[in-house]
Regions:
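A short, exposed loop/beta-hairpin motif centered on an aromatic-Gly-Thr core
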Residues: 27-39
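Short, charged, surface-exposed hinge/linker loops at domain edges
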Residues: 1-7, 16, 38, 42-68
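Short aromatic-glycine-(Arg/Gly/Cys) micro-motifs in beta-strand/loop hairpins
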Residues: 12-27
Length: 68
């Protein structure tokens, strides 16, 4: 998945019935999950938006993805 220049992984836990992932190519941990594909995508977008808002609030430069 891609959003605002960030790439996210997609995995599935059969035992929990949950899709999950994390943003790739940066050191900060940005994770997300959902019980459906749409929930996963929505949570991925929200996680990236929350990360960018936090960086702005703290006055720090957000990490950008390395060449993945």
């Amino acid at each position: 998945m891609q959003y605002k220049g960030y790439v996210g992984s997609v995995e599935f836990s059969e035992s929990d019935g949950v899709f999950f992932g994390k943003v790739q190519g940066i050191q900060s941990l940005i994770s997300y999950e959902g019980r459906s594909v749409q929930e996963l995508v929505d949570d991925f977008h929200k996680a990236v938006d929350d990360y960018l808002a936090l960086c702005e609030a703290e006055g720090s430069e957000p990490e950008m993805i390395d060449n993945v």
